[in-house]
Curated annotation (Swiss-Prot):
This protein's name: Probable malate:quinone oxidoreductase
Flavoprotein keyword on record: yes
HAMAP family per UniProt: MQO
GO MF, one example: L-malate dehydrogenase (quinone) activity
Cofactor: FAD
Organism: Pectobacterium atrosepticum (strain SCRI 1043 / ATCC BAA-672) (Erwinia carotovora subsp. atroseptica)
Amino acid sequence: MKKLLAMFFCLSVVVSAPLAMAEDAKTTEKTTDVVLIGGGIMSSTLGVYLQELQPDWSIDMVERMDNVAEESSNGWNNAGTGHSAFMELNYTPDNPDGPINISKALEITEAFEISRQFWSYQVKNGVLNNPHAFINSVPHISFVWGDENTAFLKHRYDAMQHSTLYRGMEFSDDPNTIKEWVPLVMEGRDPAQKIAATRMPIGTDVNYGEITRQLVSAMKTKSNFALHLNSEVRDIKRNADNTWSVTYADLKNGEKESVIKAKFVFIGAGGAALKLLQKSGIPEADLYGGFPVGGEFLVTENPEIVKRHMAKVYGKASVGAPPMSVPHLDTRIFDGKPVLLFGPFATFSSKFLKNGSLWDLIGSVTFSNVMPMTHVGLDNFDLVKYLVSQVMMDDDDRFASLQEYFPNAKKEDWRLTVAGQRVQVIKKDDDKGGVLKLGTEIVSSQDGSIAALLGASPGASTAAPIMLSLLEKVFKDKVATPEWQSKLKEIVPSYGQKLDGNIEMTNKIRSYTSSTLGLDYIEVKPE
């Protein structure tokens, strides 16, 4: 018996030694006020807000890639649209029995006006430089064909004219007028085809990667900010004092682990946010699951083609298609050089990030979310059918889709590029078991000490208002103080007000942001 106990003791020591050594390797690197997980547009926007509102707070940003803005915020990994609902038809669903509801469109438009104000403030204060490096005026155009779709577009246009935010939008079903707007879309098209389009001159193309890089660069100038690159978060645990310990591995240094203790943690890690939120153990995380959808685009850099198209042209999504899958032919501007993108074409991978793991989807399935995910799969057959049809597309199919928007396109001018991954949010629902949430959602603990952003569209273009909502949710008492109120109104002059219906305020804000960012401006006039 003694020999057996001795053997057991020795075995315990042998097994425990590496674990003890591993624990020793986890050195509490520091204590900080805020940890931002992920180096994308969301974390950088929140970080800049906090540096303005509470400059004495220390902030650490942890990013697994070797630079910031390398995942979803990277310019090539998203459509680069300044989502204002000027052309995105999915924000104004058809209603054959009555007037079209534009409430969601108004919400999106108001949100982007906040982003424009946030960026303008950063330009004025030297945080962002050279606005044309990250935002440019590109007209936003909706283009449809067929009796049903053209009638819908006219009804949509009529409904939107009741809002002051859409004054300046033009509607046409005249082929010659539309050809002036987008010649490539019209050349080679069947003259008998019934078509219609709307055009909003004050649309934008945005490089969110450039914004992110500039925001983080400015944050790095502050002594109480630290950026940890090549650092992958492995665990998030609540401490007895309600602070959080964030464990991360240094991917360039033998995966040595370090721990940062923080009072507040924001998980802005794109597709990885769900799994990291689950690691935190907060009960709110149990309500959510996720399903990844990837994207590909056809690209041309042929200058003879590119110079003849200066617009973002959005069509109508297929039945059951997620918002990110609305087909569009876009002018994009990278480092001052325009290119054309067409897509996206949905792809499937079980990765939650472009540079993620094939085990991401399986690893996110828990006892709490397996049934909601199953219900969503069963209740959204149109979406499943759409994704299958997209995955089955070959080069000829993709090119045929392009020719619906650019009839004279030639295959040799275009190449296929892989964009980023998006994780569509699935939320537990008492009535349906589970529902697919197609927007973005802030999830936070009851005490507001940890929060995550889940979801996809409209995403980056509304980073400023989304992070403003997060501040109001998790720092409610701080936001109510005169100091924070004053600073927020300085950053976002329209803070707390709606622009819709307020012509004077709309003109004041749009004139200010247009002049600061170097964008086209249309004065809103009374009817």
